[in-house]
Regions:
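Rossmann-like adenosine-cofactor binding region
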Residues: 3-77, 81
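Adenosine-phosphate binding glycine-rich loop
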Residues: 55-127
Length: 127
């Protein structure tokens, strides 16, 4: 997996990375739209668009703040959208479960990223 941050300040800069991107996470400051539906239409390899901006306008046009795996028909591969509050809900459930695990353990429990990821997968599988 290759992850990188990208400049999305202009349409031209977005189009330098978006057509080959599989997953995009919109993480601009509140109230800034990072990607439009028109741009998403050029994202030929996009599978997931996650937006962590819950302040209007949303960061990724077409992804609602409560969306959990909603199909984005404007994308060539019908990518799925994840909204900020849906992401936050999973994060909350994950934190709660990890705290419960720590509280019920007989000995100190140290949780690393791999453990947290496994627990998150378990939570998401039940949605």
């Amino acid at each position: 997996v290759e992850m990188f941050g990208a400049d999305s300040s202009t349409d031209a800069k977005v189009m330098e990375f978006l057509p080959e991107t599989n997953i995009v996470i919109g993480a601009a400051k509140a109230g800034v739209q990072v990607l439009s539906k028109k741009q998403l239409g050029e994202a030929k390899n996009l599978l997931v668009a996650a937006d962590v901006n819950a302040v209007p306008p949303v960061g990724i046009e077409g992804v609602g703040i409560h969306d959990m795996g909603v199909e984005l028909p404007e994308t060539p591969q019908n990518a799925i959208g994840l909204g900020a509050l849906a992401i936050g809900d999973i994060k909350y459930k994950l934190h709660l479960k990890l705290f419960e695990m720590m509280k019920s353990a007989d000995e100190p429990l140290y949780v690393d990223h791999n453990c947290a990821f496994d627990v998150a997968r378990e939570i998401v599988s039940k949605l």
